[in-house]
Amino acid sequence: TDTFEPGSTMKPFIAALSLETGRVRPDSPIVSSPGSMVVTGFPIRDSHPYGTLTVEQVIQKSSNIGTVRMAMNLQPREMWDMFSQIGMGQKPQLDFPGAVTGRLRPYKTWRPIEQATMSYGYGLSASLFQLARAYSVFARDGELVPVSVVRRDAPPAGIRVFTPETASAVRHMLQMAAGPGGTAPLAQTPGYTVGGKTGTAHKQEGRGYAGNKYRSWFVGLAPVSNPRIVVAVMVDEPSTGVYYGGAVAAPVFSQVVGQTLRLLNVPPDADVKSQIVAKVPAVEESF
């Protein structure tokens, strides 16, 4: 399969690592004013000036600045180790044609601006499969398990990436991102709680990025109360006139999740009426 820069879908992993290492709590304040910052001469911006956000709100609103501030308090080796553990830059151990490695450069070569941009998904690449597997760590209480294309009688042993407490905290952030006030209310699925993260990335063109070509992402899990599935959606060069992941990929996620959970006979865990949010405008994500 092809690989792509995953954009803002990487932000929850920076929040998780920051929680795991004790740098922050879910309610820790992070200053994003005035909506822009400079890292070694390179500007980084949010789509809106959010002021002070909690860590939870950084993920809910998809703040580049909030994510970068967390990332720059981490050591490059810590980020690299975590990215490697969730499968970035690693060839999937999967007997399936086309499984690809993606790109994650050695941490010793990272410049500060590269550490910053990798925190929101630029400067590394992954396949859609790798992203879905990475998000399974939040669905499985912080454990990453081997993937198989055939059903197994017993769940395989995995590796511990985050504590169950960290995974639970991030699941709540993902639920906030997929709700009113988040970047993807259109991901909501009647009858089920869902959580996930949008991503929108400029496409690479030559040695830089195309100004008007995008990839739109949404990666999430459901039900949040007891995750059964992880779904990753990527739309290449959306042609509807809108390109944010919350507007393009999230509705596809919603349809797939609803149909799949019903096929699996998963009982609803949410009130249908309380989830009708189609008229609630999504927050435009920063990317």
Positions of PLM-derived features:
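Short beta-strands and strand-coil junctions in structured, solvent-facing domains, enriched
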Residues: 239-241, 262-263
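Gram-negative outer-membrane assembly/targeting C-terminal domains
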Residues: 261-287
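Beta-lactam-recognizing serine transpeptidase/beta-lactamase-like catalytic domain environment
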Residues: 1-8, 13-239, 245, 277-287
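Short, charged, low-complexity patches
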Residues: 131, 245-258
